[in-house]
Regions:
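Hydrophobic beta-strand segments
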Residues: 41, 46-50, 77-78, 432
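Beta-strand-rich domain onsets/edges
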Residues: 19-31, 38, 396-401
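Short, acidic Ser/Thr/Gly-rich low-complexity loop/linker segments typical of extracellular
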Residues: 47, 53-69
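Short, surface-exposed loop/turn segments at beta-strand-coil junctions that are enriched for proline
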Residues: 72, 513-518
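A short, solvent-exposed loop/turn motif at the edges and junctions
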Residues: 50, 75-92
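Extracellular beta-sheet/turn segments enriched in Thr/Pro/Gly and aliphatic residues
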Residues: 23, 92-120
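Primarily the internal scaffold of c-type cytochrome electron-transfer domains
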Residues: 115-116, 139-204, 230-502, 510-514, ...
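Structural motif
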Residues: 29-46, 71
Length: 561
């Protein structure tokens, strides 16, 4: 059976089927048996499942299957799946039946570049995802569209911070830094100059460096628009589905990811759609690729949907020979990549939140067990709760003569990559304070202090020179000497990388002058996360407060007299 695109959005695209009663294996129950075929004959190693349950089996070399342990007397709904085929079924069968036949149909094996993307949003789109995947109370909804609409992926093309970096403006877009000045180097040609201190400075911008050259930023930020022109798509001018950022249909057309055979990360200079392989169907047909092998209609199962490799194209980036962002590669090198005991990107960033449907019941959304549906509310660098579960902070202290000696241990406990990761403007700051019983600060006599980029000045969040440590990948621009730099499209070097790999612990030590009175001393350590270096955030007008990730205090009791 082939469905038209219009019919599909109302039915197959929402991964539907009749909802059977919940089933679990039963000792001594009845059996169903049968065969899975395509037009050429039996299909070996096909997966046959009692729909929306954990009961499943695989076909033998002759395409035959049998399912044991079914409750007797109750009809079950069977589906079948195999790589390269649309999911087959549903077929209803009562236990005891041995002649069940499930037909599989191959889906397209090539990509149709002329395919027109299905829009996520209802507005202006006859066929869309919101129609079936959204609740009226979207703020508390667990349905995919409602979660995606609140997620950064759904706004990646219109993210004002991204556009301010792309265009060289402040957050409002109304103020812009001057176009980059260049000098001519006798050996290397044009080289950018530092900003003119006599001119307004709203921070760097790709388009300031390369006016008229769109670059490849849209390959990740507006992939549906950039797929046909990854090097010439200007995010300022994308329209239609392209403005939906990492939109639903794009992810559910993703069939393969290109990884370098040696490095096992995407090839250099191939970000986003440049490292993605799609299966867009021909006119009059559909193909939705997802994590369920029992979603019938023009849907198919892909194991890639459950793997970290799915995320790799947009979470690895190398510029001018420098690895700028690489959360995927960091995960690969960590213990989280263990195939048995590890965790995927999806496990942490698409956590199962208890959803039981991926479409509304009135749209025939199939009811599933809680814990089987990935959330599309993908928490990341702006999610306070996620950040507060990331690091463990331990503080020990002792009084030694006229000094209080402190040791602080910061452990990347729950991130499967470095922390912080990806965008090089992100940084994490450890602050260590000591105070007497009257809450007066004690003088620090150690050399472990925060750098200038932690903030110079008298504001409460100007931390430069205070006891503590900064964790960041600090880039320095080769030609201008600017550091730290977030203009990673320029030639840079990694001046230092103090970030914490997965499960790593960093130990720092501090000394404070103890109160002469011998009174109690309180040591407080705090870890805060900043989405950008303070000077950059100020120039851009990004009003993002520090996020407190962890805090710990110890009291050194009064010295005995």
């Amino acid at each position: 059976m082939r469905w038209s695109t219009t019919t599909l959005i109302a039915a197959a695209a929402v991964w539907i089927a009749a909802s059977p009663a919940a089933l679990s294996p039963r000792e001594g129950g009845s059996r169903v048996a049968g065969v899975v075929r395509d037009v050429r004959g039996p299909v070996p190693n096909a997966l046959v499942r009692v729909q929306a349950t954990q009961l499943h089996t695989r076909t033998d070399s002759d395409g035959r299957f049998r399912l044991d342990g079914l409750p007797p007397g109750r009809a079950v709904t069977l589906t079948a799946s195999a790589l390269g085929y649309y999911n087959g079924g549903p077929v209803s069968a009562r236990p005891g039946v041995t002649g069940v036949a499930i037909q599989l149909v191959r889906h397209v094996a090539e990509d149709n570049a002329g395919y027109e993307w299905v829009g996520a949003r209802r507005a202006g789109a006859k066929t869309n995802c919101e129609e079936c995947h959204s609740e009226s109370d979207s703020a508390s909804s667990l349905l995919p569209f409602d979660e995606w609409a609140r997620d950064a992926h759904g706004t990646s093309a219109q993210n004002p911070r991204f556009l301010s970096m792309y265009n060289g403006t402040d957050l409002t877009g109304q103020h812009r830094s001057p176009v980059t000045r260049y000098s001519i180097h006798p050996d290397y040609g044009r080289a950018p100059l530092p900003p003119n201190p006599d001119q307004p400075d709203y921070g760097p911008g790709y388009m300031l460096d390369a006016p008229g050259n769109a670059g490849n930023c849209a390959a990740c930020h507006a992939p549906a628009a950039a797929i046909a022109a990854p090097y010439s798509t200007d995010p300022n001018f994308v329209s239609g589905v392209g403005r939906e950022g990492v939109t639903c249909d794009l992810c559910h057309k993703l069939w393969a990811v290109r990884l370098d055979s040696t490095t096992r990360v995407p090839p250099v200079n191939m970000p986003g759609v440049l490292s993605m392989g799609f299966r867009r169907p021909p006119a009059g047909h559909q193909l939705f690729i997802g994590p369920f092998d029992d979603a019938v209609g023009e849907n198919t199962y892909s194991p890639l949907q459950n793997k970290s490799e799915f995320c790799a194209p947009c979470h690895f980036g190398q510029f001018w020979g420098v690895s700028v962002y690489n959360s995927f590669g960091e995960w690969q090198r960590s213990s989280y990549n263990d195939p048995v005991n590890g965790r995927t990107c999806q496990d942490c960033h698409m956590p199962r939140r208890g959803a039981t449907r991926i479409a509304r019941a009135d749209k025939k959304g199939l009811q599933r067990a809680p814990g089987t549906i990935f959330s599309h509310l993908m928490p990341g660098a702006a999610d306070v709760e996620l950040l507060r579960r990331t690091v463990r902070l331990e503080v020990t202290a002792q009084r030694r003569q006229d000094r209080v000696e402190v040791e602080v241990r910061v452990t990347n406990e729950n991130a499967g990559h470095h922390v912080p990761t990806d965008h090089p403007a992100r940084n994490m700051l450890l602050l260590v304070d000591a105070s007497d019983s009257g809450r007066q600060p004690l003088e620090s006599v150690g050399t472990q202090v925060l750098p200038e980029w932690a903030g110079v000045g008298s504001a409460a969040d100007d931390y430069a020179g205070r006891p503590g440590k900064a964790y960041a990948k600090v880039l320095e621009e080769r030609w201008t000497g600017i550091s730290p730099s977030a203009a990673y499209w320029r030639p840079t070097v990694v001046r230092e990388d103090t970030r914490l790999p997965a499960k790593a612990t960093d130990v720092t030590r501090y000394e404070f002058i103890a109160p002469a009175s011998g009174e109690d001393v309180t040591i407080t350590a705090t870890v805060v996360f900043r989405r950008a270096f303070k000077s950059l955030a100020v120039r851009k007008g990004w009003q993002t407060a520090d996020i407190k990730m962890a805090t710990s205090s110890v009291v050194v009791r009064q010295a005995p007299r």
